[in-house]
Amino acid sequence: MTQSTQDKPIENSETPYSNINQGIFFALIGTALFSIKPVFIKLAYQFGGDAVSIMALRAFSSVPIYIIMMFWLLRKTENRTNFKRYGVAASTVGILGYYLASYLDIAAMAYISAQLERLLIFLFPSFVVLISWIVLKQTPVKGTFKAIFLGYIGVALIVFHDMNNIGNNILLGSGLAVASAFIFACYLIMSKKLISQMGSQLFTCIGMGSAGIVILIQSQWQGIDVITLDPQLIGLGIALGIFCTVLPSFFVAAAMQKLTPSQLSLTSNVGPAITAVFAITILSEPFTWFHAIGMVFVVYSVVSMKKRE
């Protein structure tokens, strides 16, 4: 991708300051809503939730919206053609990214802090680089491995701190989160061509709908009765589905209409800081020099990798 391509908005040929400001506003709201997800999940665990029940509650509230949107999109002949041609592939890739990666991520939250989870997931661009290098033979540009190394050092600082204060389960939780980030990176690479062929909205609806159906089937198979769950857990699960899944996806889509890819990617860099603020104020998680330095390293690492794309 050339610099001239990156400097063009995705759908607008003109970007007056009002459009840019609106785009930044939408992108920041989307990033903020995505970033408070770990806090909601930690609270859900406190009210007796587990990975499957939390995902099931999120699916109950989000999947109907995506299904309605999908049928709305299928009014167009082009979308119906793309659905028939790419629907199975989109469903498969969606289950990989929206079910398996999400399951590992939520399972990890039983063992690690919200701040550490967000930083581990935030490092997924490093896996995209490594997979592209090893599998697709795309040589990273100079300085990329240095940026990746700094990001891992930042995470290691927080893991070291949390191991001394929480225990060795930190390693299990970190491993689950890293696996989630790796699978999400695979999902991004696999979805890139599909999104260009069928459009991001239709792909997202099919992927989210398929993943949601899988988790609902799993919850029924495991005998989880949503009605018998703690009312506060149900409320948190619904909030996860609406405020941390559906709404941010719409806000990010709206931002994509008004911002260049580089502008959009920069707004996501505030995510770990937003998670830290809510984790400290709501969950009373500690924030030490280890966390501050680790966060700086990770954010710098990701920003550096994005600049080299």
Tell what function each PLM region has.
Residues 66, 131, 140-162, 215, ...:
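Hydrophobic transmembrane alpha-helices of multi-pass small-molecule transport proteins
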Residues 39-47, 51, 78, 106-110, ...:
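Membrane-interface helix termini and inter-helical loops of multi-pass transporters
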Residues 2-57, 95, 166-193, 211-213, ...:
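Glycine-/small-residue-enriched transmembrane alpha-helix faces in small-molecule transporters
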Residues 31, 57, 116-123, 190-213, ...:
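Helix-helix packing/entry segments at the starts of transmembrane helices
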